Amino acid sequence: MMQPKRTKFRKQFKGRIHGNSKGGTDLNFGAFGLKALEPERVTARQIEAARRAITRHMKRAGRVWIRIFPDLPVTSKPTEVRMGKGKGSVDYWACRVAPGRVMFELDGVPEDVAREALRLGAAKLPIKTRFIQRIAE
């Protein structure tokens, strides 16, 4: 699973996702992509599950680019522990995804294969998504 090699601080504030994505809204690498339509935190496990579903359907053909990275540490306190006594330890890593953000890109496969692969990957994610493709020039 993806997580940063090192960070300046171990824990971060929860934060909010305001407005649309400021960058990463266009296809940069592949011919097909999966774009987020709503704001949400996506965990490293969800990203990995989607990646596995996509590559499994593509049967190792083509190429997959993951355009999001889980760099947000999410903390939690153990069960049945009273409030207070400081912030909990890091439980998992997540990524804030704003509407309009391209999360996955594919290339080297036909459109019908790419559409089905990204549909299977989108089922593993907690947000509504849209299939996008590069406009033929």
UniProtKB/Swiss-Prot annotation:
Pfam families cross-referenced by the UniProt entry: Ribosomal_L16 (PF00252)
Keyword tRNA processing: no
Gene Ontology CC entries for this record: cytosolic large ribosomal subunit
Alphabetical UniProt keywords: Ribonucleoprotein, Ribosomal protein, RNA-binding, rRNA-binding, tRNA-binding
Domain of life: Bacteria
GO molecular function, one term: rRNA binding
Gene Ontology process terms (BP): translation
SUPFAM superfamilies noted in UniProt: Ribosomal protein L16p/L10e (SSF54686)
Its job: Binds 23S rRNA and is also seen to make contacts with the A and possibly P site tRNAs.
PANTHER family tied to this protein: 50S/60S RIBOSOMAL PROTEIN L16, LARGE RIBOSOMAL SUBUNIT PROTEIN UL16M
Family per record: Belongs to the universal ribosomal protein uL16 family.
Subunit structure: Part of the 50S ribosomal subunit.
The protein's name: Large ribosomal subunit protein uL16
Gene: rplP
